[in-house]
């Protein structure tokens, strides 16, 4: 704690490799964390592969900062750190204080890991570790164990000062949200689409969400589930816009006039056409879906080819080759799985045929679609859409979830 504030040090991830765009990525990372923590007036700086964060020294500010760091894309790890002057005396004093605190918490052994980023410093990394470790060992606070220590004390000698920290928490890696443009996620209430959205967020893309419902055939709880999923994604992406479109009249028309095996695929074709209009309105440059090849009948190669032909925008399918167990594991890690398994149907499961078409031809499906004269219904669905802006929330109020 320095000057009444709490310091955090984070290791910047993949963006440090992008030399041509490095400063742009650093600025975006600074901006993202500053926006996440705007309620507590943080000081954020990124330089030389490290993110430096200073927040007020209060429980609420520290809780908010640590929760935001746990959702921040673009860092590989972070820790609460102690800043001190770049002298061996100051570094040793701070390290001894860390060791004493660890001993009070019941720790018995330690190891020093030192890194000298400033090559002008008077000691090498190994010399720093050796000298500081010797002082702690001789003081009797902790015993040395280089292989299986109870605590590791990290020392980093940076350009302007030194930082010491103990437990380092794992970051989410990836790229800062916002450096890769904007996409529109077709968000259902299932397990897959939220994971697909997270995958694109982790590649630096800002995502907005589109949900299709068929009220009263789908219950209000189904939409509430999707709203909760969008709130989770907004924590990783800072914010999102959720657009809700009713497909009730379109599904009635399909149920009455379309060939039964083609029902689901024709509905997907309608979704893609509406999604393109929503995407262009929101300046999204691509559509994102949770489709995984051959996972269900509507996701055969031929069916995906048909739906891709319904839009001029690229369709990103980040889960196309993913294993279902891997998808579930990711959903659990990011906090969407428990929401996704709530037992409420979405519009895609309504009126689903027992024997859906598996190997359609694009031309044949386009003929079927055109014969149904769905244009006015699609226009009505788009015209009556509803939008909600959702912001990521961080802090003490979130801790009970």
UniProtKB/Swiss-Prot annotation:
GO terms for molecular function: ATP binding; CCA tRNA nucleotidyltransferase activity; tRNA binding; tRNA-uracil-4 sulfurtransferase activity. It holds the Pfam family ThiI. Keywords: ATP-binding, Cytoplasm, Nucleotide-binding, RNA-binding, Thiamine biosynthesis, Transferase, tRNA-binding. It is an enzyme of class 2 (transferase). GO terms for biological process: thiamine biosynthetic process; thiamine diphosphate biosynthetic process; thiazole biosynthetic process; tRNA 4-thiouridine biosynthesis. Its main location: cytoplasm. CDD domains: PPase_ThiI, THUMP_ThiI. ATP binds at residues 186-187, 211-212, 268, 290, 299. PROSITE patterns: THUMP. It catalyses: [ThiI sulfur-carrier protein]-S-sulfanyl-L-cysteine + a uridine in tRNA + 2 reduced [2Fe-2S]-[ferredoxin] + ATP + H(+) = [ThiI sulfur-carrier protein]-L-cysteine + a 4-thiouridine in tRNA + 2 oxidized [2Fe-2S]-[ferredoxin] + AMP + diphosphate; [ThiS sulfur-carrier protein]-C-terminal Gly-Gly-AMP + S-sulfanyl-L-cysteinyl-[cysteine desulfurase] + AH2 = [ThiS sulfur-carrier protein]-C-terminal-Gly-aminoethanethioate + L-cysteinyl-[cysteine desulfurase] + A + AMP + 2 H(+). Its EC number is 2.8.1.4. One of its GO terms (cellular component) is cytosol. It is found in: Cytoplasm. Pathway: Cofactor biosynthesis; thiamine diphosphate biosynthesis. It comes from the Bacteria. The keyword Nucleotide-binding applies. InterPro entries: Rossmann-like_a/b/a_fold, ThiI_AANH, ThiI_fer, ThiI_N, THUMP_dom, THUMP_ThiI, tRNA_STrfase, tRNA_sulfurtransferase_ThiI. Disulfide bonds: none annotated. Residues 63-168 form the THUMP domain. Belongs to the ThiI family. Catalyzes the ATP-dependent transfer of a sulfur to tRNA to produce 4-thiouridine in position 8 of tRNAs, which functions as a near-UV photosensor. Also catalyzes the transfer of sulfur to the sulfur carrier protein ThiS, forming ThiS-thiocarboxylate. This is a step in the synthesis of thiazole, in the thiamine biosynthesis pathway. The sulfur is donated as persulfide by IscS. NCBIfam families: tRNA uracil 4-sulfurtransferase ThiI. This is Probable tRNA sulfurtransferase. It comes from Treponema pallidum (strain Nichols). The lineage of its organism: Bacteria, Pseudomonadati, Spirochaetota, Spirochaetia, Spirochaetales. The gene is thiI.
